[in-house]
Amino acid sequence: MNTQKNLMMFTIVISAIYGVWAIFAPGHILSTYGTPPELINPLANNIVMLFGVAAWVVAILGWHIRSTITEVNVEKAMSCFALAWLLYGLHGVFSEKVLTWPEGLEPPAFSESTISGIVFLVFSIVHYMLRKPKSS
């Protein structure tokens, strides 16, 4: 069950780091994801900060789930973590494809968001494949 707990800790750490980044440097996140400087304003920064708080909520809930898992419920917990990574991944891959962009602001075909979405989908698959502890 150590493998499952380590994978859960990975999710917790990533969420905490992203949360700190979003709370304390929202403009940097926006520029990293290709937002033009003229669209980075206090409203956009506050929205990113809100998502930073949400990332901390994910980290805290993940920490709680990790501390309460047993051999009986570890598979269900890992499935929840896999589902969370799946949703993050689908958002990253499809968000730029579904939005209507003003002319000149269209994201590149293979942007940071798309790349991170693919990475998150891989995390989802890993979490799902390793959801059961090895039998003793």
Regions found by a protein language model. Give the residues of each.
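Membrane-helix boundary connector in multi-pass membrane proteins
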Residues: L90-E112
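Membrane-interface helix-boundary motifs at transmembrane edges
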Residues: M1-N2, R66-E75, P133-S136
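Core segments of alpha-helical transmembrane spans in multipass integral membrane proteins
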Residues: A16-I17, P42-S67, L83-L87
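Cytosolic juxtamembrane helix and N-cap/initiation of the first transmembrane helix
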Residues: M1-I17, K132
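Hydrophobic alpha-helical membrane segments
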Residues: A77-S95, S116-F123
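Hydrophobic transmembrane helix segments
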Residues: I14-G52
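Membrane-water interface at the C-terminal end of transmembrane alpha helices
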Residues: I118-S136
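Membrane-interfacial loop-to-transmembrane alpha-helix junctions, especially the N-terminal start
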Residues: M8, V72-F81
